[in-house]
């Protein structure tokens, strides 16, 4: 089934309703729709979101919201009566990269994460616990849980072990690897990493 990522722009929602994907994941498009971490600003866009969600539901399209892993935001998402949430894993991915790669030694370094190894390990553990806790909370609210943003072949297993998360949205990493291995092998390699026997 097709999961189409889109903004809450009314013109875009009209197009999505004509296309009729199985699911639409509402994501930030403008700076004013983004939280500091990167998920949708649910509070600031509640009424616009409700209109978009109502229209999508009227067209028999499931809705997912791309949100930060915070219980307050999950609660608001549940009140909007969406079927899915996608937890933003960008903070986790950034901390992982700063801890386990040479990112801090490049011009792409993340200034606010230029910390000691011990501090980065602590931040990584906190980030994983936050995603785990948010996933459990969302499941109690009968939401289906996906996760994505910055997931790759190095960090995905830590997230794939969270049993409440039933879908991982990984694009750039697979496509980048496929340039060297071919798409089929890139997909099979990722599937091998995320399977939980």
Show where each model-derived region lies.
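Alpha-helix-loop-beta-strand connector modules within alpha/beta enzyme cores
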Residues: 1-6, 42-64, 109-146, 190-197
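Glycine/small-residue-rich loop that forms an oxyanion/phosphate-binding "nest" at active or ligand-binding sites
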Residues: 1-46
């Amino acid at each position: 089934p097709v999961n189409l990522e889109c903004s809450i722009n009314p013109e875009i929602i009209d197009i999505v309703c004509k296309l009729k994907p199985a699911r639409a994941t509402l994501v930030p498009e403008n700076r004013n729709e983004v939280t500091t971490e990167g998920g949708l600003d649910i509070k600031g866009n509640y009424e616009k979101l409700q209109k978009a969600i109502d229209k999508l539901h009227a067209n028999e399209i499931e809705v997912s919201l791309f949100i930060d892993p915070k219980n307050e935001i999950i609660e608001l998402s549940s009140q909007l009566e969406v079927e899915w949430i996608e937890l933003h894993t960008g903070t986790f991915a950034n901390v992982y990269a700063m801890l386990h790669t040479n990112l801090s030694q490049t011009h792409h370094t993340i200034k606010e994460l230029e910390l000691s190894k011990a501090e980065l390990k602590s931040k990584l553990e906190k980030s994983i616990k936050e995603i785990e806790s948010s996933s459990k909370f969302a499941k109690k609210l009968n939401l289906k849980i996906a996760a994505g943003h910055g997931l790759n072949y190095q960090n995905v297993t830590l997230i794939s072990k969270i049993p409440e998360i039933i879908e991982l949205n990984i694009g750039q990493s697979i496509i980048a690897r496929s340039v060297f291995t071919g798409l089929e092998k890139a997909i099979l390699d990722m599937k091998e990493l995320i399977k939980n026997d």
